[in-house]
Amino acid sequence: MSDSLPLLLRAARGESVERPPVWMMRQAGRYMKIYRDLRDKYPSFRERSENPDLSYEISMQPFHAFKPDGVILFSDILTPLPGMGIDFDIIESKGPQIGDPIRSMAQVDALRPLNPSESMPFVGEVLGRLRQSVGNEAAVLGFVGAPWTLAAYVVEGKSSKNYAVIKAMVFREPEILHKLLDHFAESIANYLRYQIDSGAQVVQMFDSWAGQLSPADYDTFAAPYQKKVVDLVKKTHPDTPFILYISGSAGVIERMANTGVDIVSLDWTVDMAEALARLPEHIGVQGNVDPGLLFGTPEAIEARIDDCVRKARGRKHILNLGHGILPGTPEENGEAFFRAGKSVMDRLGAVV
């Protein structure tokens, strides 16, 4: 009986549900005091995300506090890099730092195929524990970074405002970039399969920086590798719902739907009704409340959620923010978001 399955999983599969499921990107993180206290005790991000006890505890913090409909693995999109031979660290206030940025074909040729069970057994352990702990009260989500976004980090060596280094590679040495992207696509597909086999019920691919590409370059350097990941995962796990998120995606929404994903996660810069008009009926949506709204009042949060859900009615919809919750967000407003999301049908009425 599918009613015994988690609400988010049923909604992501396109079943008729009593309300849109709700979770938040970065729902485990700095806006929560309990997380900040743990961070003070364990200042290394890599330790927090790679020690299975800490990763599990952090993943569960928002579940204990707010009971979201999805519990996402606490990790990072860069976590698989060392398994391919790329070292990195995440420095507080500076973000990711790549020890030896990839700029040559020789460096790409030297990369190892990713074997997640060997290089990241902690991920499998945490996902299994999450499934056991939340049962059918929430769906367990796994996630990865998409090939283009991983390439942007490893070529630039760090976060970037203008992506000049990787853009230079796009236009001067595209053959190096294509080989790197292909390696990442194969590895990321393996990583997602491992996550699903370990307990992830729904998966999301973040192509955070693909919004920096023109549509033509998106078609060349992002979409084919997104599609390769999706195809490889769907070949072995056809029933696992697949979400794709891009920050700044308003110009490529239709292209996102062509990658084979089940759900397009929208940022807040596009109107929900207008986005749905641009997407085929079978494609679901996730989002797309402005995370900045969570600095407002509970009444404003409720009104905006109502508007978002009203516009998405009749379509497969997962309520979320249009980006990760921002550091400094009042924790009580995170709670208000979940409360308003769970009670939305009391205000709007009828079945989704």
From Swiss-Prot:
Keywords: Cytoplasm, Decarboxylase, Lyase, Porphyrin biosynthesis. GO terms for biological process: protoporphyrinogen IX biosynthetic process. Pfam families: URO-D. It is an enzyme of class 4 (lyase). Pathway: Porphyrin-containing compound metabolism; protoporphyrin-IX biosynthesis; coproporphyrinogen-III from 5-aminolevulinate: step 4/4. It is found in: Cytoplasm. GO terms for molecular function: uroporphyrinogen decarboxylase activity. Substrate binds at residues 26-30, 76, 153, 208, 323. Its EC number is 4.1.1.37. One of its GO terms (cellular component) is cytoplasm. It catalyses: uroporphyrinogen III + 4 H(+) = coproporphyrinogen III + 4 CO2. Its main location: cytoplasm. The record marks 76 as: Transition state stabilizer. Belongs to the uroporphyrinogen decarboxylase family. PANTHER family: METHYLTETRAHYDROFOLATE:HOMOCYSTEINE METHYLTRANSFERASE RELATED, UROPORPHYRINOGEN DECARBOXYLASE. Catalyzes the decarboxylation of four acetate groups of uroporphyrinogen-III to yield coproporphyrinogen-III. Homodimer. HAMAP family: URO_D. This is Uroporphyrinogen decarboxylase. It comes from Synechococcus sp. (strain CC9605).
